[in-house]
Structure formats: C-alpha cells, structure tokens
C-alpha cells in the first residue's frame, strides 16, 4: 500500500506519495489554496485517494516544532487542529492510519537538494513544499519500512 505525506502550511500544501512497496517517495503536487482553507486540502486528499484507487493506507503529516528544543510553536497547534479534522474526515475509513512525522529541517533539506540539482530560485519557490513532503515521507519510510 502507498503512503501519502503532507507538508501543510497556511496557504499551500506539498504532497508526496510512495510506491506500492513503500520504498520510494515521489513529489506529487504543490497545492495552493486560500489562507487556512483546510476543507480545500481535504478535498485534494480525496481527489488523490480516487486517483490512486484507494491504495493509500497511511497519511503522514509533517509535524513542526522548534528546531533547537522540539517545543511546540504556532504552526504545531495549526497542524494538530488539522490532524483532528483529518481524523474526523476519515472516521469511517478504519484502514487509513494518520501519523505525525518530525519535519524539522525538511524545507532546508529540500531546498538544498533543489539547489544541488541546479534548479533556479523561481522554480524552487514553486516546488519546495512538494519536495519537503518528499523529505518527510522519506524519513517516515526509512523508520517504518518493515512495519
């Protein structure tokens, strides 16, 4: 089964998806929406579920904390609220697991990878959330490959 990762912000959400074996993470979309319109994000997730024939069994949500001490910040509470919304949205889908994955440094790693690949700054801005979702998903997959 596939895993879907989200790098959620207030106006955009990066999506990444794994292969069926849960080994390879690929960037999927950099979804732009009205500020805090998380209903639009849920609709996008539903669309992805349909496009992938309901082969997704896990949603991995990037969990932001303060870089140095791991304490919660404003974005952490936003993500926790979205997690609750996501749980309610998939209440009748017992097979879908929703988990957090530490996203500290994911944007920095994604941006550096893009720069190393000679991607221009304007393009980096357009795809960095999607690539951050890839980093988040890779982290999750590396820890949970045999589970």
Swiss-Prot record:
The biological process GO terms on file are:
rRNA 5'-end processing
Q: List UniProt keywords, sorted A-Z.
A: Cytoplasm, Hydrolase, Nuclease, Ribosome biogenesis
**Listed EC numbers:** 3.1.-.-
Q: Which Pfam families does this chain map to?
A: RuvX
Primary enzyme class: hydrolase
Q: Give its localization.
A: Cytoplasm
Instruction: Name any GO cellular component annotation.
Output: cytosol
For this UniProt entry, which residues form the secretion signal? none
Q: Name one GO molecular function term.
A: nuclease activity
Listed SMART domains: YqgFc
Query: Which InterPro entries does the record cross-reference, listed alphabetically?
Result: RNaseH-like_sf (IPR012337), YqgF (IPR005227), YqgF/RNaseH-like_dom (IPR006641), YqgF/RNaseH-like_dom_sf (IPR037027)
Q: Which CDD domains match?
A: YqgF
Q: Name the NCBIfam families for this protein.
A: RNAse_H_YqgF (TIGR00250)
Q: What does this protein do?
A: Could be a nuclease involved in processing of the 5'-end of pre-16S rRNA.
Q: Mind telling me which PANTHER family this protein's record contains?
A: POLYNUCLEOTIDYL TRANSFERASE, RIBONUCLEASE H-LIKE SUPERFAMILY PROTEIN (PTHR33317:SF4)
Q: Which family does it belong to?
A: Belongs to the YqgF nuclease family.
Name it.
Putative pre-16S rRNA nuclease
Taxon lineage: Bacteria, Bacillati, Mycoplasmatota, Mycoplasmoidales, Mycoplasmoidaceae
